[in-house]
């Protein structure tokens, strides 16, 4: 049977239309499929918890930590955050003040874990961090800490807490060996430190390192947290006639007062301490008492190994809006770099699940950006850390670190130590 000519034309036109519609539909599907991994339809903010001393003698460290983590989070967000599937993730920082008090630190960590739902955390205070490390593991909360006590390392292999500060037990041998080589006429060392867990770790590590370096180790002097007058303790330690006095691990405010007291009592030897900046010490003690001091701070001097990102941090601290900003602190570079390790691990893992991020950190040979140093790399577990901690060495970061000499009231690089 013949089909009328008009009907044939209609059928042809309809077929052409259907083919065109199918092609457009397929093309749209292809475009949608290609963009689903890069275009997010959902936004989610991940809270990064920080428990640290924002007031009290250790506040310069705590404010440095809050600033460093916040600025690293800002940079993570500015670089595009992290898109996984149809969700775009950015970071925000929640910082709580523990005033370097164990009870406050414990309450803060519990609040962030149980009430605020934080899954990524930075902690500072020794006893609180130690006490709650098992809880954080049970709750699968990834925690980076700067606790000096090596018990934070002596955890099960599945622990979720990592020390991202080169603990003094790792640094002690190189620090004292460098002093011995650089100041060959100095033969003896004594420790003036806090009467707590942190102080005990400092004392034990120094004693072992002194023996390895060939330095005479004198009796340590301990003082209670909150001490305002250091005259009795300085008098006691000077009676031993040490060439080197070590105050590593002591709060910044205490180090400044000790330096001032040592100078007032005529000490002419070497005062060596930890991550304390010349600018903070200058405010407390003045220039003369801190001249020649050794610290583990990173001098923000251009033209060397220090990265441009870190060199720009002080100006960003001053310009940043909000309470507790407007001042640049000594150790912001360190906490900025530590936070960068965590955030780089998130990106490499392509996940905001702490379990997945932890697996990336634990991966053999994994390397992460260490922002303080040009082309800086950080790893967890190395010959240096494994030699001290054995199977637990994977919970200790290994990276290059500076020895700083204060000259004319300013930080200068004495040397950069690269762990073997």
What do these predicted regions represent?
Residues 39-45, 60-64, 82-155, 164, ...:
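Beta-alpha junction/loop-to-helix N-cap segments that form part of ligand/metal-binding clefts
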Residues 320-332, 343-410:
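Segments of small-molecule ligand-sensing domains
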